[in-house]
Amino acid sequence: MINVSNPFPDNEIISFYDCTGMPIFYLHSDGENFYHYDGTPLAYLYNNEFIVSYSGQYLGWLYNGSIIDYKNGTYVFFTVYSSGGPSRPSRKARPSRASRKSRPSKLSCNSRPSRPSRQIRWSERSNMSFFRS
């Protein structure tokens, strides 16, 4: 069943793709934690909407199944559930998932920045640099 505030089905692993269609990371079936395919924890989903680093920095937000960058309002990643936004390339095959590594402790969230206006284009950070903000 799809949660009203979260566009993804419960208990499903959701792959996120970059602007070239390459699978970069996934949302674990717990619906909260994002992992790279090598098992590295990347960030978590806060209030079913915001992507937050474990250091407490707001990185982006979910919008119609895609992730929007807090830096400039551009589209960073998409899923099979994405709608709207810039044109999406064909999705490439997903790599196998390695065992998940332990997650770091979540630090207190920083103040949430104001959202920039959405831009209907791909972010230059549609890659792992998004998580190194």
Question: Language-model segments: what does each one mean?
Answer:
Residues M1-M22, Q57, Y63-S133:
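Long terminal segments
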Residues I51-V52, L59:
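Amphipathic alpha-helical packing elements
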